[in-house]
Amino acid sequence: MKNSSLLFILIVVFVISSSENGIMIGEAKKCSNSWICEGDEKCKEKCMADYKGNGTCYYPSPPSKQHPEFFYPTCWCGFDC
């Protein structure tokens, strides 16, 4: 009983000391939003102002018959949730 308690304490101390700050922190979840792009600069500015993220314009190929809505340039904004 005494040895198992000592072993448990040593394992706990090892786990705490092996982590950077003693606290395990998970990564932030990534989210995104998109809207019709009005230019790269406006896209970046709006994304930063509204979401504190990184925005970029995506210029798709000409529309297909299946997805004509994809013709418009789209501002894609990626940010931490």
Curated annotation (Swiss-Prot):
Q: Does the keyword Disulfide bond apply?
A: yes
Signal peptide region: 1-19
* Matching InterPro entries: DEFL
Q: What are the GO cellular component annotations?
A: extracellular region
Is Cytoplasm found in the keyword set?
A: no
* Compartments where located: Secreted
A Gene Ontology biological process in which this protein takes part is:
killing of cells of another organism
In terms of superkingdom, the source organism counts as: Eukaryota
Cystine crosslinks = C31-C81, C37-C57, C43-C75, C47-C77
Keyword annotations of the record:
Antimicrobial, Disulfide bond, Fungicide, Plant defense, Secreted, Signal
Name the Pfam families for this protein.
Answer: AtDEF-like (PF25052)
Q: What protein family does this chain belong to?
A: Belongs to the DEFL family.
Task: Kindly provide the name given to this protein in its UniProt entry.
Answer: Putative defensin-like protein 188
- Protein's organism: Arabidopsis thaliana
Q: Which gene encodes it?
A: LCR41
